[in-house]
Curated annotation (Swiss-Prot):
InterPro entries: NA-bd_OB-fold, Ribosomal_uS12, Ribosomal_uS12_bac. It comes from the Eukaryota. SUPFAM superfamilies: Nucleic acid-binding proteins (SSF50249). This is Small ribosomal subunit protein uS12c. The gene is rps12.
Length: 124
């Protein structure tokens, strides 16, 4: 336990938490423009072709974002909404594109977990 005089001389240090999504700059989502849309392969034990996009954000950062769901309509110059959330088997991919927002369409023929993929309730 420090004395009051020691605290006057050298105050207690605040523990700063390092953010996992620095490009969002304390916002829940950010808008950006796709500069490149391409596919990549995951790390070792997994095997797939994952769809990703390089996005220039309004905060000035250029990040790699994952495109979730089956099929997409994104191309270069598409305006997209980015949220945090990494993809465990893709190194360097720390953001997700929000489906159904701005230029990104919802996933076709999706009936379950629709809210996560930007799909309206089907007419029954």
């Amino acid at each position: 336990m420090p004395t009051i005089q020691q605290l006057v001389r050298l105050r207690r240090i605040q523990i700063t938490k390092k953010t996992k999504s620095p490009a969002l700059v304390n916002c829940p989502q950010r808008r950006g423009v796709c500069t490149r849309v391409y596919t990549t392969t995951p790390k070792k034990p997994n095997s797939a072709i994952r769809k990703v996009a390089r996005v220039r954000l309004t905060s000035g950062f250029e990040v790699t974002a994952y495109i979730p769901g089956e099929g997409h309509n994104l191309q270069e110059h598409s305006v997209v909404l980015i949220r945090g959330g990494r993809v465990k088997d893709l190194p360097g991919v720390r953001y997700h594109i929000v489906r159904g927002a701005l230029d990104s369409g919802g996933v076709k023929d999706r009936t379950q977990r629709r809210s996560k993929y930007g799909v309206k309730k089907p007419k029954s």
